[in-house]
Amino acid sequence: MNEYIMSDLYRCYGKKNFMTLCRGLIEDPGFNYMFWLRMCQRGGILKLIALPIHKWKRTFGKINIGYKCQIGYGFYIGHGGPCVVSDSAVIGNNCNISQFVTIGSNEGKSATIGNNVYIGPSVCINWRQCNYRSWCDSG
């Protein structure tokens, strides 16, 4: 199984097994969305299967993250969205985003978010470089 999917699963539930994967796909809209996004990024036949599912979820769901967006290991979407992340955004490892988050740009490339960042509810990031660590990690 894809290391990215397993790291997202571990970030959400603290476990990496088949039953937890099934639970995440059924119960957690954020993890379910990320599962299909990660499958789109794999390529091959899996991408052909996952692309229409991802497109449907992106169009009719509460989460809008393009499969071309670069997202590191251990990504977590709190409360199942809603959130919007531009295709050109880059998000580091072990990042959390909460509900009503928008990461994009009015022109050009979107923001680059560093590792171990928590983005709280209703935040809109429109800048190019946002390599700030979460406030709780700044110690």
Please provide the spans of the model-predicted regions:
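Terminal amphipathic alpha-helical/low-complexity segments used for targeting or macromolecular assembly
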Residues: 1-62
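Left-handed beta-helix
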Residues: 66-67, 72-73, 78-87, 92-93, ...
